[in-house]
Every structure is written in structure tokens, then in C-alpha cells.
Regions:
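Extracellular/periplasmic carbohydrate-active domains that bind, remodel
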Residues: 1-420
Length: 420
């Protein structure tokens, strides 16, 4: 697949055939508000007070030189080549013939389009509501949702089978398949799914609260003898549905992934967490809206034993943490020993939710986290670092600056402390 990720000399960029999205760390000496100049082939292309910039109306398959400067000199420079223009695979056209009426379930048609998608092709969703069950993506592919297009997961648990190896609340286990599944979980290995783009102006949504309730009810029945025999364990959990609730799927599950770019979309109503990346590297999420109002454990963006994960210019309306930085729980997370590090969160806004959190699952360690220019005033927690007494692990090198926060909390919590 033509490369869409570039990182060099202090700058990182993602590109399409006609655009480049560029970002950089805020300089240590910068004030709360600074102006940056972006030069494209030695000519000023943009002035911005943000630490990111998108340049559009570029030429496909063209090499550009980028340079960012501010009052104290250079931020960095980067040479980048835009991708070729991709051929569109319209999901409504033959041989897929998906129906965007909000009623027909298109799982087979959409999976065929995904399976057919090559590295120089793009799966295209025109406006419409495309109902589906679980879908499995592969390396070197792109989904593009046009404005008004909704990829809508059903609320039927049967549509999220088979169960897959996953990790929830710090423990590896079998969970329902997510709406979108990228990669296969393996804590002993590197990436097995790479170079995937999810972008556009549309929405990727799942069954939300109703799907969660149905899965929990089914799992509660399946585990009724175990729950009855382990009443003491159940009493130490957050609530009676904690254990049966752990098999719920995420909205987008990224296991052992690398070079994943999510841009411009609305992600909504996973049955638990929305965007979950575990044992993954180089995940970029920008200019997205994440919604999970009323969903229990409805986290927005969760890097978990992952590295080089960046989110910026995003809005959150979540039923739990907007961002939750994790790395496993209790002995298992410590033994697996895959820390989360090199995390960047900037220019993000909370309209509802719990804010930005590190933990409580962090026994694999968390380090090198930088957060700046975020508004978490409308959140219940603001910034929270939380652990339990038996976690182990570490949290270090966390830098937070130029943010509006409702609270700052560093504390021990008494829930979610069971584990292998």
C-alpha cells in the first residue's frame, strides 16, 4: 500500500491523494497561545495557533517538502509524497448491492467488499444507513463514509459472533466480536494488521445500550452457576453486571495493529468502549466526534499496552472516560509487561463524560504521556490518574499543560481489583 504515514525531524503526517494532515508536539518554551507557520515547498501555506494543520487541494503522487516554524525558530521539517488516487468500490453497486435503507442487514455484502478491497482501492459508502453485523478488516485497505452515510451495527448479539480473543478491563478473555475488527490478539507478537484508513464525513455506530443489555442478560444466564458460587467475588466488583458485562464488544477493536488512521468520522454507541487499541503502534485519530451517551463503560479512545498513539481535534460526548490510557491488570498485565507509552492528546474537547484518565488498569506501566490544549471543563473527572492497591506497574513522565480541567485527581480506587 502506498505509504500514508510519515514521521521525520519532529513532524508527523498522514496523507491522502489530495491532502496532508500534519502535527507536532507543543514546544517546551511555548506559551499558552502561539502562532505557527507551515511552509509547503518553501512558500507559506498556513498560519495556525494549533499544533496541527491540514493542507488540501494537493496533487496525487507528488512529493512535497514541509517546514513548520514559530517565533523561536524551527519546529521541524518533513518530506512527504501524496498517495495515488484510489479506485472506489461503491458498496451499493454490483456485485455488493448493499441497501442503505436502515432496515436490510448487509453483513455479507459489506464483508465481500472488504475482502475484495486492494491496497489501491477504497470502500465507498454513499449517504444512507447500512445495517450490519460484525465485520473483519485486513491490512492495506480504506473505508470512506460520505456525509450522511451511517455504518450501523445491529442490536442483536447473534450478529457479533463468533467470540474472539480480546482484552477488557485489563484481562485477556473471549469477547463478542466488535463491529469493526482489525488484527488478531497476541501479546507475544508484533503487528498482524497494518495500514488501514477509516475516514470521511459519516458515522460508524453500533447497538449501544440495547446491545449491551442483551449481551449482559445472555451472559448472566450462561454464568448463573458461576456467579452464584462466587458471590463474594461478585460483591467486590463495581456492580452485579461487571463480570457478565466484560464480554461486550467494542465499536472498533484494533489488536496487534500498526499504522491505523481514523479521520473526520463520528464514532458512536459501542456496547462498551468505542475505539480500543491493544498491543498496537502508530494509531492516529483526528477531527472525529465520539458519542456514547448513556452507555455503561462507554469510553471514547483507549490505548492499551500500545505505543505512539495520538488523538487531536476530537470532541467527546461519552458515557465514561473520553480517553482512558491502560496497560493490563494485576499479575497478568505485569507478566505480559507491555507498557503504554508515547501517547499524545491535544486540542480535544469534552461536551459530556468523565474526561481524561490513566488507569485503573496500568500494571504493565504507562509512560511518556503529553496532554495539551484540551478542554475537559464539562467532565466529571477532568484529569484522573487512578490505580488499585494490587496493580503494580508504574505511571511516569506525564505532562499536562494549557488545559481547562474540571478536576485533577490522583488516587486509589476500590473496584475492578479481581484478576488472574
Amino acid at each position: 500500500m502506498p505509504n500514508h504515514f510519515f514521521s521525520q525531524n519532529g513532524l508527523t503526517a498522514c496523507c491522502t491523494d489530495t491532502s496532508i494532515t500534519l502535527f507536532w508536539d507543543k514546544p517546551a518554551a511555548a506559551g499558552a497561545v502561539e502562532t505557527y507557520t507551515v511552509l509547503l515547498d518553501d512558500a507559506a501555506a498556513a498560519h495556525t495557533q494549533k499544533t496541527h494543520c491540514t493542507l488540501e487541494n494537493l496533487r496525487p503522487e507528488t512529493t512535497y517538502s514541509l517546514f513548520v516554524q514559530w517565533r523561536s525558530g524551527s519546529i521541524g521539517e518533513l518530506t512527504i509524497r501524496t498517495t495515488p488516487t484510489k479506485r472506489c468500490l461503491d458498496v451499493t453497486a454490483s456485485p455488493y448491492s448493499a441497501v442503505g435503507d436502515g432496515k436490510a442487514v448487509n453483513t455479507a455484502a459489506l464483508q465481500k467488499a472488504i475482502d475484495d478491497c486492494g491496497e489501491r482501492e477504497q470502500i465507498y459508502f454513499p449517504a444512507g444507513v447500512y445495517c450490519t453485523g460484525t465485520l473483519r478488516l485486513h491490512s492495506n485497505m480504506e473505508l470512506y463514509l460520505e456525509e450522511g452515510a451511517v455504518l450501523q451495527g445491529t442490536a442483536d448479539p447473534e450478529d457479533y459472533l463468533p467470540r474472539i480473543s480480546s482484552r477488557f478491563e485489563g484481562t485477556e478473555m473471549e469477547c463478542y466480536s466488535s463491529l469493526l475488527n482489525l488484527g488478531t490478539l497476541d501479546h507475544t507478537a508484533g503487528p498482524n494488521c497494518e495500514n488501514v484508513i477509516l475516514r470521511g464525513k459519516g458515522t460508524i455506530a453500533s447497538g449501544g445500550k440495547l446491545l449491551a443489555e442483551r449481551i449482559i442478560a445472555s451472559e448472566r444466564e450462561r454464568l448463573k452457576d458461576y456467579l452464584a458460587q462466587n458471590a463474594t467475588l461478585v460483591s467486590t466488583c463495581e456492580n452485579a453486571d461487571t463480570i457478565p458485562g466484560r464480554v461486550r464488544p467494542r465499536l472498533v477493536n484494533m489488536s496487534n495493529c500498526r499504522n491505523i488512521w481514523m479521520e473526520g468520522l463520528t464514532f458512536a454507541n459501542g456496547a462498551s468502549w468505542n475505539l480500543h487499541m491493544v498491543y498496537s503502534d502508530q494509531i492516529v485519530t483526528d477531527h472525529c466526534t465520539i458519542r456514547s451517551d448513556g452507555v455503561w463503560n462507554g469510553d471514547g479512545w483507549d490505548p492499551d499496552s500500545s505505543t505512539n498513539c495520538t488523538i487531536f481535534a476530537c470532541e467527546f460526548f461519552t458515557g465514561d472516560d473520553a480517553v482512558a490510557i491502560k496497560s493490563g491488570k494485576n499479575p497478568e498485565g505485569n507478566i505480559i509487561d507491555r507498557p503504554t507509552k508515547h501517547i499524545r492528546v491535544f486540542d480535544c474537547h469534552s461536551g459530556f463524560g468523565h474526561g481524561i484518565c490513566i488507569g485503573s488498569e496500568m500494571s504493565g506501566g504507562v509512560e511518556d504521556v503529553k496532554i495539551w490544549d484540551c478542554d475537559m471543563a464539562v467532565s466529571t473527572s477532568g484529569l484522573e490518574i487512578k490505580v488499585t492497591k494490587k496493580r503494580g506497574g508504574y505511571v511516569r513522565n506525564v505532562e499536562v499543560r494549557d488545559c481547562t480541567l474540571s478536576h485533577v485527581m490522583v488516587h486509589s480506587v476500590g473496584y475492578n481489583d479481581d484478576g488472574i
